[in-house]
Amino acid sequence: MPYPGLEVVVQYWLYSLVDDWHSTQRSVAIPGAGTVRMPGIHQHHEGDWEAVTVGMSADRPLFVDWSAHCAGEWRPFAGATLVADPGGERTHPVSWVALGSHANLPTPVTARPRWWNCDPRVATFVHQRVQAVIGAVAIAALGSRLDDALGILDRAGSGTPQAFPLALVNRTTWPMTFPGIWGGRERMEVGPAGRALGWSPPTPTLQPLWRNPLTTIFGDASRSRGR
């Protein structure tokens, strides 16, 4: 853990009614196969929890972590984009929200989504279904460019940051006392074919980021340190 002076961890949990992400469908020129229209991909489930975590010493903030589903990104506090209350200092880190997936991000980017690596079954199913649609020859020709050709992207706009009302909660406060998941099965659809893969997320108090925030943020190889 890179912050020996850490004393307090504050988390801001954000809830969305539904996760409803679509790929950016493209036509791609493939050697030996001509121009191929790639199948669209749709990922969706009910209920979506994301979190921003701020670690502080006795006198200053130290780092910020954006959950971005299962594989987030943390930065030293000085590396976060900060905004101010009217007439105040810049002390509030900004979280940009990706369209559809609601992945919370430290910058307004268009990039490969981190949830893509959350469950190996997702990538396996998608690649198998894509091969069934465009054929093994086209898959081999695309090689490492396949995911880019499929338009698997999170897209976060660069609008003006907004503040929202906060409610102070702990593990004994509703809705953190709900002992279950926040919806039904998660589905992945590739073209006309779909499959249930996984479930909607559980209440934050049942998630590793709440129960063991430092181990989750700094001990998980899938999470990354930004600038």
Labelled PLM ranges:
Residues 3-11, 17-227:
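Domain-length functional cores that host ligand/cofactor binding and catalytic or interaction surfaces
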